[in-house]
Amino acid sequence: MMSVRAINGCSIIRTATSAGGPPVSLFRHRIQRLRASHLREFSKLRLNFPLIRADRRFLGNSDAPSCSTCIHSLVESVSEELESISRRKGSRMRVRASVKVKLTSYGEVLEDKLVNQELEAGLLLEFKKDADRVLLAVLHRRDGKKNWMVFDQNGVSCSIKPQQITYIVPNVYNFDHTGLTDFLQRAQDNLDPQLLEFAWMELLEKNKPVTPEELAEMIYGRADPLESYCAHFLLSQDEIYFSILESKGSRSIYSPRPTEQVEELLRRQRVKEAEDKEFQEFIQLLKSAKKAPSHAKPPKSSWLADDKVQDRIGSLEAYAIDAWASTDQQKLAGTILKSMGLQKTSVSALNLLIDIGYFPVHVNLELLKLNLPTHHSEAITEAAEALLSESSDIDAVRRIDLTHLKVYAIDVDEADELDDALSATRLQDGRIKIWIHVADPARYVTPGSKVDREARRRGTSVFLPTATYPMFPEKLAMEGMSLRQGENCNAVSVSVVLRSDGCITEYSVDNSIIRPTYMLTYESASELLHLNLEEEAELKLLSEAAFIRSQWRREQGAVDTTTLETRIKVVNPEDPEPLINLYVENQADLAMRLVFEMMILCGEVVATFGSQHNIPLPYRGQPQSNIDVSAFAHLPEGPVRSSSIVKVMRAAEMNFRCPVRHGVLGIPGYVQFTSPIRRYMDLTAHYQIKAFLRGGDNFPFSAGELEGIAASVNMQSKVVRKLSNTGLRYWVIEFLRRQEKGKKYTALVLRFVKDRIASLLLVEVGFQATAWVSEGKQVGDEIEVRVEEAHPRDDLILFKEVI
């Protein structure tokens, strides 16, 4: 037998010349480096163990050669011997994992080695503090029948259970707990993971198990308390070379793993080390991006260029909106947050993504949570473009030419696509004839087509302060479907003749061609009406018709619900401080009332037309509340009265076979028809009406099919409506946050919620909020308030009355 011994800090390995040892290449490769992964495992003890230094001398023998010299000599000797064995044998022999079988001949010895020491005060031991930590401690006194009080290495006194004890350091009695720090320091100086590898090679050849004390004798030359503990620590933290063969209480016996298993574990370790290195590089990238000024942060695209980086960022994104796809994704995000020194919360993930520049400061979290489509796929876009270039107008021969009419399209100034426009003339008998021209998307799209299915899936266009996500691909909507000023446009025109009292006397629905004359905003239309220009007599006629229609509806029991409405447009929303344009629209404004009345008139005519011809349509109705609205007559007309009335209104109802009275609007039936580019249910009404106009009753949808479509679309519309309201509220709060501190706002008291807490309407902002108001204030009173706190991300705004 060849025997080489290095004492205290180097190693002792007895290598037999018998066959069956590990391959020479494995030994040569392993002997030359210390594995960083093992040192990371030792960090669980909260220690940083240094590598064995080359200039270190053996304790107790100052004339002995250095550790590095011994190891070098050991490498040469053992390598030469193993090469000689390899040549003689001609091939490597495998070591069979039959340790347990061979142990049966000395089972009694095994049992003896597993005998646990009696617990008593003064013993030095290791115990498991939690899932990630083991600590050294000294037994102090009993705590109840089974537990013990200990002083741990951090100077903390605590109670432990016997099951927590992982090792009792042998031959140590009455240990002074103040010496724990010194013991740990000496253990730190004595640990060398490479020694474990040498021992594995010798024990594998002998197919022999080992206890910590026996390993200490092998690698340190003695089994004193310090060396025994170091050997235990090396074995207990090792995941490569040894596995537990038997265990009882705090005693364990270890067995060397087979060569093939060790090689596989080492391979996995190398993979893990590479992954850990890559992960740490990613963490460093996050830290660098976080520290960088806003103008120097990496663009969002840079985080998506690499698949692994994209996956990690994706896990944080999912964590931020509480929508992880798997527990693995959740754990990955948690690991990233922990590595960044952050709490494992959705808020931490969100703030991190904002800090690195991946998310803008004002990212719309609700939009991300809902996962609504914000772009059309390439397939849908291509299909839409094909419709523009290839589709023919099957209604061309049936279209009436209305290009001679003056046509007004009135909408908000940032409207992308225009669904409707208006015309009017006075007949010779004095009656007013009105045309409501509606865009004709069914000229291009047919039920069940690819583009139609996508529109149905979306249900509606999404209008947010920061962006618009159209139901149809933009090019098709803008260039094909939308009404465009000065161009011939396909439309479905609803014409109505009104009596002087506002009642409908004649009506028709036709496919048409129109040429829009004016594209007006509500503000410009109102200005033209106030100017009362002779050359805009048609606009004046429309306003007159709107007035008499409003009067007629009131006589039929209609309820006025006009109020103030906020509209916000954010310019450059990706900027940390984007420009916020806020508009307050009064629904009682002349132009807004005009458009509102004409849309209701169109809906009534379509419902009547559908009823007359038995056309299945999405008829909408709303039963009036059984509360007499005259009970609110004492309240100021406008937002205050409307707010109280709306509170008692019942929900809308739908019927798909015949009209339902719409009590709030004061009309016998109603069908939403004027926004087919923006709302899918309006489009279904177009499909049905146009099928009838083509000369038959072969409708695309039965009443039952319409009901099914409506259920799905209405659900989607509710989601979009909530998203729009949430986005609007966020930006109103952000707008108010930026205003001068202490600025006063006029507010109307709408109602009292509880005691003196009132629901308010801020007149200058068109925003509803709650605040405590002073004694004596009544519903309808005007008060002044100021903003106390405004946090849009937390959906928090607090107002205080200025007294």
From Swiss-Prot:
> What residue stretches are annotated with the RNB domain?
399-694
Coiled-coil intervals: none
Reaction catalysis annotation = Exonucleolytic cleavage in the 3'- to 5'-direction to yield nucleoside 5'-phosphates
Tissue localization of expression is: Expressed in seedlings, roots, leaves and flowers.
In a knockout, what does one observe? Shorter 3' nucleotide extensions of mitochondrial mRNAs and reduced accumulation of several chloroplast rRNA species. Germinates only on sucrose-containing media, with white cotyledons and pale green rosette leaves.
Q: What class of enzyme is it?
A: hydrolase
> Which terms in the GO cellular component ontology are assigned?
chloroplast; mitochondrion; plasma membrane
Q: Which UniProt keywords apply?
A: Chloroplast, Exonuclease, Hydrolase, Mitochondrion, Nuclease, Plastid, RNA-binding, rRNA processing, Transit peptide
Where does the transit peptide lie?
A: 1-35
Q: DNA repair among the record's keywords?
A: no
- A biological process (GO) annotation for this entry? chloroplast organization
EC numbers for this chain: 3.1.13.1
Q: Which Pfam families does this chain map to?
A: CSD_RNase_II, HTH_RNase_II, RNB, wH_RNase_II
Q: Where in the cell is it found?
A: Mitochondrion; Plastid, Chloroplast
Q: Which family does it belong to?
A: Belongs to the RNR ribonuclease family.
Q: Which PANTHER family match?
A: RIBONUCLEASE (PTHR23355), RIBONUCLEASE II, CHLOROPLASTIC_MITOCHONDRIAL (PTHR23355:SF42)
Described purpose of this protein according to its UniProt entry: 3'-5' exoribonuclease that catalyzes 3' maturation of chloroplast and mitochondrion ribosomal RNAs; degrades short nucleotidic extensions to generate the mature 3'-ends. Involved in the maturation of 23S, 16S and 5S rRNAs.
Under what name is this protein listed? Answer: Ribonuclease II, chloroplastic/mitochondrial
